């Protein structure tokens, strides 16, 4: 009964109405897809519903309308959407729950640029109509590699400027054994200059280190910049390189330099989490700002250490970028997909991809992720 909750529900209603209005004006058809479906491999566990009429058999609740909307495209419906209820049996998080509602859509015979134009237009229309806010278009684009290298996240918060920097070559100039060992084993050293944070106590720095450890880091090194150079933390190992460090990192007196060494992904995500924590501590996350971006050029596959095989990074129906098709099976880890995420203020708002429309390419993808021809035919024969 609170006014705050009523206001949010009213806004949700207005947003839903504006989405429908915009998409229908752009020749989309709203089509409802089944809720009780066959279980197919997706990103999370299915919720299962026992069948009364066929004892021992189960329906699954949809994690997304993925397969149905692909069938709609094949059937000649060029533009589809629905406000879809989705169900995923996964651990609860701040931005994850067992059921959610998503704006689901699919388009036929389009490029990535066409999709971006539709989504950007929809968000611009919805924000203006419901909140009176003008969103600058087009949205900036970051490759997955750039987002991870600069912000330590594939859903970066762009409301503040702190950027990760590569410290690997500078680490070679120092005498810090841990960093040299990391580099020798093929890892990287990342740096983050926290402007004006040199007055942070060891207790506060230890809290930042704990944030990094949550993401797999072994520790967090630091040094402070003052008028005559650097001091504290690991500064004694870099005394001979202090001027070059300050110059290349563009640090200034009063700054805190945070350093982290590990294999590339762990180093990026761990220091990225520290960056995010600093954004909160320094009140840099303005709730009245909306900073959108497209993250593109994601890897198509990721290595599953436990099962010793390749898994799809998103799902199995994403088209590889054309330049990788000749050597798809030789080096799956290097293959980039035609997929993209829309992010805003550190949150992933949307995810999409260009779908595979060639059954031979689809069979090759199934083979790489471990499906035999028989298994692929049994599970996805209706699609192939």
Could you say what each language-model-derived stretch is?
Residues 1-384:
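Class II aminoacyl-tRNA synthetase catalytic cores and aaRS-like
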């Amino acid at each position: 009964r609170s006014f705050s909750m009523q206001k949010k529900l009213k806004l949700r209603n207005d947003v839903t109405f504006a989405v429908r209005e915009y998409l229908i004006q752009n020749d989309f058809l709203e089509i409802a897809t089944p809720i009780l479906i066959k279980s197919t491999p997706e990103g999370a566990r299915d919720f299962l519903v026992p069948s009364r009429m066929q004892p021992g058999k189960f329906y699954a609740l949809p994690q997304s309308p993925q397969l149905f909307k692909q069938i709609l495209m094949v059937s000649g419906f060029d533009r589809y959407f629905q406000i879809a209820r989705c169900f995923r049996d996964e651990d609860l998080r701040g931005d994850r729950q067992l059921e959610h509602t998503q704006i689901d859509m699919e388009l036929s015979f389009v490029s990535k640029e066409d999709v971006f134009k539709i989504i950007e237009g929809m968000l611009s229309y919805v924000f203006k109509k419901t909140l009176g806010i003008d969103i600058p278009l087009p949205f900036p684009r970051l490759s997955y590699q750039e987002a991870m290298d600069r912000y330590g996240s594939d859903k970066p918060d762009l409301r503040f400027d702190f950027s990760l920097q590569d410290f690997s070559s500078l680490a070679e100039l120092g005498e810090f054994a841990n960093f040299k060992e990391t580099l020798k084993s093929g890892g990287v050293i990342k740096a983050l200059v926290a402007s004006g944070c040199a007055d942070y106590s060891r207790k506060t720095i230890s809290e930042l280190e704990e944030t990094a450890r949550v993401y797999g880091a072994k520790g967090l090194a630091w040094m402070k910049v003052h008028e005559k150079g650097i001091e504290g933390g690991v500064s004694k190992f870099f005394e001979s390189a202090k001027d070059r460090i300050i110059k290349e990192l563009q640090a200034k007196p009063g700054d805190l330099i945070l350093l982290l060494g590990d294999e590339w992904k762990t180093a990026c995500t761990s220091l990225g989490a520290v960056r995010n924590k600093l954004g909160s501590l320094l009140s840099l996350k303005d709730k009245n700002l909306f900073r959108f971006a497209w993250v593109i050029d994601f890897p198509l596959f990721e290595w599953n250490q436990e099962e010793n095989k390749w898994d799809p990074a998103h799902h199995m129906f994403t088209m590889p970028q054309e330049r990788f098709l000749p050597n798809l099976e030789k080096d799956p880890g290097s293959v980039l997909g035609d997929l993209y995420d829309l992010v805003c203020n550190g949150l992933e708002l949307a995810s999409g991809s260009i779908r595979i429309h060639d059954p031979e390419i689809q069979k090759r993808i199934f083979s790489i992720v471990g499906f035999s021809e028989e298994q692929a035919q049994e599970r996805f024969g209706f699609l192939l």
